[in-house]
């Protein structure tokens, strides 16, 4: 069993999200629970509830976290923000590959998970659910 960490944990919310992504990748979304994530982080079972009210909210935070990381990486990869420049597409394509090589767990979480993939790829919901993607749609 994991040893419980002291109260001041650091960035617990980020660690909860990262551990939840790992659990979903390794065991599937049905195996994810707030209790399991707390154990993986070495905190009390009540600690995650300071950040997420339930499993669904944690999963939504995971999806949003990955989406923001990915969008930021892509946006930071291009120096010429002109979408008419053909080089921009090449740079974005290379950045896409680089990001998922660096963060393979995120790739698995998004594209090897039916529910996550369905939610992220629904363009009508992008504006409301993933505002970080809006600059990419222009």
Q: Residue spans of the language-model regions?
A:
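N-terminal intrinsically disordered/low-complexity leader segments
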Residues: 1-11, 22, 82
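Short, structured helix-loop boundary elements
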Residues: 13, 34, 56, 60, ...
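Helix-turn-helix
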Residues: 15, 19, 23-57, 61
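Short hydrophobic clusters on alpha-helical segments that form packing/core surfaces
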Residues: 16-24, 66, 70, 74, ...
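Hydrophobic/aromatic residues within well-ordered alpha-helical segments
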Residues: 55, 62, 66, 70, ...
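Hydrophobic alpha-helical connector segments
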Residues: 61, 76-106
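Amphipathic alpha-helical packing segments from all-alpha helical-bundle domains
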Residues: 75, 87, 119-138
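Amphipathic alpha-helical segments used for helix-helix packing
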Residues: 101-120
């Amino acid at each position: 069993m994991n040893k419980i960490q002291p109260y001041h944990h650091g960035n617990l919310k980020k660690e909860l999200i990262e551990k939840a992504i790992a659990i979903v990748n390794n065991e599937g979304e049905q195996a994810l629970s707030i209790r399991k994530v707390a154990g993986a982080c070495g905190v009390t079972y009540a600690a995650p509830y300071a950040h997420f009210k339930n499993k669904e909210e944690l999963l939504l935070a995971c999806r949003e976290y990955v989406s923001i990381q990915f969008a930021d990486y892509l946006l930071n990869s291009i120096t010429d923000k002109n979408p008419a420049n053909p080089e921009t597409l090449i740079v974005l394509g290379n950045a896409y590959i680089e990001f998922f090589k660096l963060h393979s767990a995120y790739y698995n979480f998004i594209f090897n998970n039916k529910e996550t993939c369905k939610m992220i790829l629904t363009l009508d919901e992008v504006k409301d659910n993933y505002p970080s993607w809006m600059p990419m749609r222009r």
